[in-house]
Amino acid sequence: MWFVMVPFLTHVLSSLKEFASFFSKTLAKRVPAGGRSTVEHHEYLCHVHSRSNGLVAVALCDREYPSRVAFTLLSKVTDDFLAAFPVESSWHSVRDDGSGSSHTPALSFPILDTVIEKYQDPAQADPIMKIQKDLDDTKVILHKTIDGVLERGVKLDSLVEKSNDLSLQSKMFYKQAKSQNSCCGMM
């Protein structure tokens, strides 16, 4: 079983790194070729993406990291890896721990660091999450604007009622216009 381990732990102690490596290898062996799986372990999720050619990518994330984005990351990493090493023999001969056999050097995959850095903020890396974040921000602004308009409407009602300068006919016109405009409110 061959895999690329993608740890999302920023300050990994050696013992934690060792455990993450063991946990990743164990899970990579248990996911069937072409399958995907997520396993929960304490405060972390371990996402596993296995390709039909035997290449497996694993991401260790906290619970807040969106699973869909994690699997998008794993798919991108495996695609980039296969683009960099298209011949299976170039990576099938590499041992599980990333070191080469006595005849094969370890594979260098510098793109991995760039991809991991990009995916640290899922809202920036994933277009769907970015759109959702923009929609949420717009919704908050819209709610504030509507609340402000409604608040101004209440103040205007109060001013009209208190005004001695407006005739009874002007007050009736204002109330009638307001009731007719209310049928056209936003839903």
Outline where the language-model segments fall.
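Acidic, low-complexity cytosolic segments
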Residues: 1-157, 161-164, 168-187
